Amino acid sequence: MNKEERAKRQSKIRNFSIIAHIDHGKSTLADRILEKTNALTQREMKAQLLDSMDLERERGITIKLNAVQLNYKAKDGEEYILHLIDTPGHVDFTYEVSRSLAACEGAILVVDAAQGIEAQTLANVYLALDNNLEILPVINKIDLPSADPERVRQEVEDVIGLDASEAVLASAKAGIGIEEILEQIVEKVPAPAGDSEEPLQCMIFDSLYDPYRGVIAYIRVVNGTVKVGDKVRMMATGKEFEVTEVGVFTPKTTQRDELTVGDVGFLAASIKNVGDTRVGDTITHAKRPAAEPLAGYRKLNPMVFCGLYPIDSARYNDLRDALEKLELNDSALEFEPETSQALGFGFRCGFLGLLHMEIIQERIEREFKIDLITTAPSVIYKVYLTNGEDVIVDNPSNMPDPQSIDRVEEPFVKASIMVPNDYVGAVMEICQGKRGTFIDMQYLDETRVTLTYEIPLSEIVYDFFDQLKSNTKGYASFDYELIGYKPSKLVKMDILLNNEQVDALSFIVHRDSAYDRGKVIVEKLKELIPRQQFEVPIQATIGNKVVARSTIKAMRKNVLAKCYGGDISRKRKLLDKQKEGKKRMKSVGSVEVPQEAFMAVLKMDDN
């Protein structure tokens, strides 16, 4: 293509994504848009086409982002090229959303006509505004009997401050209003800015590993043009590769000769290691590099850590391979090897949040058929010592000796919880029980309130979300952002079995709830550990102080069975002999902790 053709083509490109709260109908709308633009034959069409992972289809949530190129003939008779980038809606995957928004010029904001605006909708709108996107409000599900589009329109204006007078009323399920949405995209979303003659700048917004072609980078071209055979350089790592293919997704991968400004597509360059294509990095030409990388987005830091161990220790290497493969597509997953006396060899993994953690575990068990034990999730603590040093602790067993600790700080989050009036009391109770500090309360309309709390991340990690949903009958929606570290009275609690510490059961807990938590765990272990030939004490300790204890009684043989009546001294002798034996056994005996006991303690909640 020459320069004029490229410029004409560029003016016809529209890049947009769809943002919404979970279940407001984002994936269904994407399906209808694909159908309307004839991207697929009727036969290929299936519900939630862009959610390609089994897990996504099963849970009905979008986890990974996806991109498609569509051709649309507008009412003005011109052919437009639309790039739809699908995004997840769940709080743990906000990062996936921010990546896809960075590759767009516009966003369709889908709001449920019955439920109105929810916490995640707001969080994503702010992300879109940060990226200066043109936002087109769409009120979806207007065919529901409980729909109230006028109220929702008012809500969009009041809460977000967008002009909703031209908001499209649609029903993705029934296919109402889809054409109006497409016309608005063509009309209101700006064409990509950028110059095809400038040095190449492509942003990587995702990557995927293909066993035959190596790493495939999903890119959005911001400036310049990239063709097969070009030598390209990754600006973050400085590594160079030769491009073997470029193309676009029409959901299927379709090869093209070149990608130019505004194109969203893929690039393969027989890259072996996914670490070389960091998400958010800029690709440029090796011969004529760009002066500086694009304002990439931040490196994502995991918030929640836990240990993953294979139940069958022989499968340690398989687990490593599984984690490496998942890491290829999941830039936020981090892991490093770790060993535990109780569980053997495994990995310490970092995740964005609890849903992310669950999904990774489920994918390992499903796709790689490895059974896992997971230790209790923990967060990163900063520990300041009396000698002036500070240590970062992401694993309770690395906590320094209590005598040498000056203070401990833990991460706090600002949680915004949207909830109907009737449940405000219940939500406040949960937040206070989780050591939350009340910050603010705002009424969105007559029926809904936003509560803002500062809560320690370690309390949210545990079972906050489940409690929130069950105590508000599922009506509360919840979003959080990290605000930094604050000092807390935290202690490390160890569990001793027969006076030996079990490292996998150590955890860090707030001093006020330490006693209760210790007591519950000790009782639970007493039920689950089988009786031994000797008496086994179970203790919960903080430093050298035992805060809770319980004892598993010994099994014993009736040594007096052979005595018919007879003298007490004879019986004494036999009983004392038995006692001696038990004592000796206790000093050398070791106690195996069964799998169920670990699982039960890790799953235990605070009540």
Curated annotation (Swiss-Prot):
One of its GO terms (biological process) is positive regulation of translation. GTP binds at residues 23-28, 140-143. The keyword Membrane applies. GO terms for molecular function: GTP binding; GTPase activity; ribosome binding; translation elongation factor activity. It is found in: Cell membrane. One of its GO terms (cellular component) is plasma membrane. It is an enzyme of class 3 (hydrolase). Pfam families: EFG_C, GTP_EFTU, GTP_EFTU_D2, LepA_C. Its main location: membrane. Residues 11-193 form the tr-type G domain. It is a peripheral membrane protein. It catalyses: GTP + H2O = GDP + phosphate + H(+). Its EC number is 3.6.5.n1. The keyword Cell membrane applies. Keywords: Cell membrane, GTP-binding, Hydrolase, Membrane, Nucleotide-binding, Protein biosynthesis. Required for accurate and efficient protein synthesis under certain stress conditions. May act as a fidelity factor of the translation reaction, by catalyzing a one-codon backward translocation of tRNAs on improperly translocated ribosomes. Back-translocation proceeds from a post-translocation (POST) complex to a pre-translocation (PRE) complex, thus giving elongation factor G a second chance to translocate the tRNAs correctly. Binds to ribosomes in a GTP-dependent manner. Belongs to the TRAFAC class translation factor GTPase superfamily. Classic translation factor GTPase family. LepA subfamily. This is Elongation factor 4. It comes from Bacillus cereus (strain B4264).
